[in-house]
């Protein structure tokens, strides 16, 4: 009877392996552009004052790029309309005139759709992998607890034969 349980366990986990393969991610800067890039010259980012060296026209070529801070001073004198942030952040910055930009580097991609330019913020795949790991862990825990309950119930009923 344990062969059936092992077979069900292997088949169940194989379906989870297929789902986990779809959650794999590539390098975080594969399809991103620096927002301050004009004419192939790297300019400091508006929100984090960071230059991305190595950005070129061939952006699909794989390679490692590093972020280099150009200054440690906070960014002032930037119009709020130029920053690619959500509306809740924009309202918070308008209410507080002494708000400064944080020194957090984010990835922004600029896409052109029907002549309009859309800026989106891309998240890394770590949250997806974490969520898949939690789901797999919970399912495995339920399976182990169920197997223990089945073994205990069989032993109590007298039908258990090792």
From Swiss-Prot:
Q: What is an annotated GO biological process for this record, any one?
A: regulation of cell shape
Chain ranges on the Extracellular side, renumbered to this chain: 23-131
Q: Where is this region: Requires for dimerization and lipid rafts association?
A: 133-137
* Any one cellular-component term (Gene Ontology): ruffle
Q: A GO molecular-function term, please?
A: protein-folding chaperone binding
Consequence the record notes for mutating residue 52 to A: Eliminates induction of platelet aggregation
Q: What keywords sit in the KW lines?
A: Cell junction, Cell membrane, Cell projection, Cell shape, Cytoplasm, Developmental protein, Glycoprotein, Membrane, Sialic acid, Signal, Transmembrane, Transmembrane helix
The membrane spanning regions, by residue number, are: 132-152
Instruction: List the residue ranges of the region (Requires for interaction with MSN and EZR).
Output: 154-155
The question of whether Translocase is a record keyword is answered with no
- Those parts of the protein on the Cytoplasmic side are 153-162
Supply the InterPro entries for this chain: Podoplanin_domain
User: Which residue windows does the record flag with biased composition (Basic and acidic residues)?
Assistant: 109-119
Which stretches of sequence are listed as region Disordered?
23-57, 85-119
Query: Found in which tissues?
Result: Highly expressed in placenta, lung, skeletal muscle and brain. Weakly expressed in brain, kidney and liver. In placenta, expressed on the apical plasma membrane of endothelium. In lung, expressed in alveolar epithelium. Up-regulated in colorectal tumors and expressed in 25% of early oral squamous cell carcinomas.
Query: Which Pfam families did the record assign?
Result: Podoplanin (PF05808)
Polar residues bias: start-end ranges:
85-108
Q: Which residues are glycosylated?
A: 25, 32, 34-35, 52, 55, 65-66, 76, 85-86, 88-89, 96, 98, 100, 102, 106-107, 109-110, 117, 119-120
Complex formation = Homodimer. Interacts with CLEC1B; the interaction is independent of CLEC1B glycosylation and activates CLEC1B; the interaction is dependent of sialic acid on O-glycans. Interacts with CD9; this interaction is homophilic and attenuates platelet aggregation and pulmonary metastasis induced by PDPN. Interacts with LGALS8; the interaction is glycosylation-dependent; may participate in connection of the lymphatic endothelium to the surrounding extracellular matrix. Interacts with HSPA9.
Q: What does this protein do?
A: Mediates effects on cell migration and adhesion through its different partners. During development plays a role in blood and lymphatic vessels separation by binding CLEC1B, triggering CLEC1B activation in platelets and leading to platelet activation and/or aggregation. Interaction with CD9, on the contrary, attenuates platelet aggregation induced by PDPN. Through MSN or EZR interaction promotes epithelial-mesenchymal transition (EMT) leading to ERZ phosphorylation and triggering RHOA activation leading to cell migration increase and invasiveness.
Family, per entry: Belongs to the podoplanin family.
Domain writeup: The cytoplasmic domain controls FRC elongation but is dispensable for contraction. The cytoplasmic domain is essential for recruitment to invadopodia and ECM degradation.
Q: What protein name does the entry list?
A: Podoplanin
